[in-house]
Amino acid sequence: MNYRHGFTLIELMVTVAIIAILSSIGIPSYQKYIKKAAVTDMLQATVPYKMAVELCVLEQGDLTKCNAGSQGVPTGESTRYIKSITVVKGVITLVGDKTLTGLTVVMTATKNSNGRLNWNGVCTSADLSISESCKSLFGFTDVGDG
């Protein structure tokens, strides 16, 4: 008796088709999670800048003296997903890299009647899903149009 060994062409083609279908579903989902992780990295990068601006306002009395590189506010550093961070008069501006399709986050502090700072901001990107993710993670009430 002759026994066949191996796979038939049809079996191999079905396997390739199944892998292609799974890849077409999985890769976009993976890219979405990568972008969300990048926005989360952006959020984490703002913490020392926000804290420094708040301390600067406490010591100096107003936001106009709170600039990057002075009054304890760190100079702008880039990270894996952030192209640049600037602080001018207490306004923190972050510009994302190509992973974030040009996401720009502008965070503005305003003093309330108790002398505390309230942070508001706008996320602007060519990709609306990144803007929405930014709005959600940062807790902003406004999303800029890309």
PLM features per residue range, with description:
Residues 1-41, 45, 49:
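N-terminal single-pass transmembrane signal-anchor helix
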Residues 29, 37, 53-56, 114:
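Generic hydrophobic alpha-helical segments
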Residues 5, 32-35, 51, 83, ...:
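Intrinsically disordered, low-complexity regions enriched in small/polar residues
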Residues 42-63:
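N-terminal alpha-helical signal peptides/signal-anchor transmembrane segments
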Residues 57-146:
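Periplasmic/extracellular, small/polar-rich flexible segments of pilin-like filament-forming proteins
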